[in-house]
Structures are given as C-alpha cells and as structure tokens.
Amino acid sequence: MGASASGPECSGDEPSRPINVKVNHFFHDPTLSSYTSTENIPWEGNERMILDAWVRPPFKSLKDVLAPTPGARPSVKRSPLVSGYERPQSMVQKSVDLFLQEMDEAGVDKGILVGRQAGHRVVSNDDIAELRDQYPQRFPLSIAGINGADVPAALREVERTITKMGFNGIAVDPGWWVPAMYVDDPRIYPIYAKCQEHGVVMYLTCSLMQGPDISYAEPWRIQRVANDFPSLQIVVVHGAFPYTSEMIGVMIANAPLGNLWVLPDFFQSIPGFPGAQDWVEAANHYLGDRILYASSYPVRPLKQSLLEFQRFSYKPDVLENLLSKNAANLFRMKV
C-alpha cells in the first residue's frame, strides 16, 4: 500500500488500458498542476465503474460514527437532513457483510474509507487500516482522521498513518474540534504543511453542521488555505453548504492552481435540497473534472444515494467523471 496520493495498485481480472477523459479546457493546463489531466490513467475494462468517495462501514469504532453529541438537541423528523432516509440493514445489524452486499446491490464497485477524530466522534485509524487490508479490492483508498486540537499529537498521527500505515490522505473537521477552529486558523497550518510535504490528499469537512455557527463553512477561508498551500490537494466535503454559490465561485477562482475539489454528497442528493441543481449546472459546464460522488454512508444508504444522485440531468461524460474518474485522477489511482 503506497503512502502518497499516488494510491495503491489493485489487480483486476481484466488487463488495464489507457483512457482519455474529456477535461474542460478551463482547467486543463498541465503546466499548472499535475492533477489537471485524467489522460492515460490505467482503468479496468468496466467503463461504468462507480467509486464512492466517502464511506464508513459498520466495523469496530466506525459503528458509532453517528453517535449523538452529548447534550445536543434531539433530531426532528422535519429536518431535511433526514428527508426520505431509508435506514440500511447493514447499519441496523452493524454488519460489514451486509454492507458489502449493499455495495453489490447498489452497483458500487469501490469505496474510500474516511476517518474522523473530532470531539466525541472518534474513529480509530487502526480500525480503518484493518478493514482496508481485509478488503483491498473494495477499499483501495483510506483517509485518516486527525484531531488538530493537539497539533503536536496530530503531526505525529499524520506521520504514522502516512509513512507507516499507507494512508492516502488526511481528514479534518476543524469546526468540531474542541475548541472549534476555522479552517484558516494559523494553528492548523502545520498540519496542512505536513500533508503537502507528503503529497497526500486533504479531506476538509465544511458545512452548516461543522461548527458552532455557519461561519465555520465560509468558502473564502477555504480559498485562503488553497492559496497558501498550492500543492495540497483539498477536497471540500459537504461543499461548504449553505454557501453553494460562493463555493462554486471559489472553485472557479482556483482554476490557475487546480488544487480544490468538492464533494457535495448528501447535501446535493437529498431531493429538493437548496443549491443541489447549482452543482449540476457547474459540473455540466465548467467543473466536470472537480466534483466527486459520495454517499457519505451511513448518513445516507448506498443505493438510495446513488439513485437520488443519478436522477439529475448530468451529461453522460460528466456523470462518468463524477462517479469514478475524477477520484481516480485525484488519487492517481491504478485500479
């Protein structure tokens, strides 16, 4: 298992072959970033491969990832975040075998395991590595969760997970740390610098839920980090909702650097959610090589998420990019 963003090599039954993906010329300038072209990435014979860029199967410490915050107000049925939610049996029974079965039923070929260490929400990176190693064909990529509230400890964990455990990236939730931090807080910068040094991907979670108030999702702060660390590939998880238009603007402004990606996940796939169609228009016209598909399981079920995502009117080549090829490009995968 490789320890950089180049990702692992996973053998398949069919020989790999080069593909040429249509990349919007607004972003396509190989002199600016090694991530701006998806040409000649070895790919399996299955053109319709689906890679879910954010999953947390029910395995050991991942089983409790949705545990409620102590002292938090109870969830309410009228919340759009639970609109039409179909609780998957794999989550009910806490079964990895059922999760793999649900992957097959949904047509999801591979998933990226994503950790989290924020407040009481702690997923063991050792558990993620164990699950990844048990099912390397299903989970070829892994992202380690890091708690930046203790920077020296966080830097040690970055070093351990990347250099010794073969993780492909780091996930941070600054708004959920104790104390909460904005993404451009200077205290976090050593973590960004360490990730940039190792050439791994940064999953940066920003939305109305991550932080004491929605100011913790402000896209201009994300833009500042991207500018300050131009070689750090940053995936904005949840798309900085509710600042959808502003986030799209930041993505456009980031074109010369080409180091920002976005993962709108359930904030887009929930039917009728505000701003969802904006991502479709952006993908179809100028961000088709910058958006990743993810269910964010267990927040939304695998099959339900995919069906809700596919109901949008994406151009066929754009849909293919979002469902797998953009993630392959980001991680420079050989699958």
Describe the role of every protein-language-model region:
Residues 10, 25-53, 60-110, 160, ...:
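Mid-to-C-terminal alpha-helical segments outside catalytic/metal-binding sites
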Residues 27, 165-169, 174-292:
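Catalytic pocket-lining loop regions of alpha/beta-barrel enzymes
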Residues 122-126, 153, 180-188:
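Active-site-adjacent beta->alpha loops and helix N-cap segments on the catalytic face
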Residues 54, 103, 128, 142, ...:
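Divalent metal-coordination and catalytic microenvironments
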Residues 100-102, 107-123, 127-131, 136-146:
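Short, well-structured secondary-structure segments
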Residues 2-23:
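Polybasic, low-complexity intrinsically disordered segments
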Residues 82-93, 141-152, 181-182:
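Active-site mouth loops of central-metabolism enzymes
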Residues 54-60, 205, 238:
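Histidine-centered divalent metal-coordination motifs
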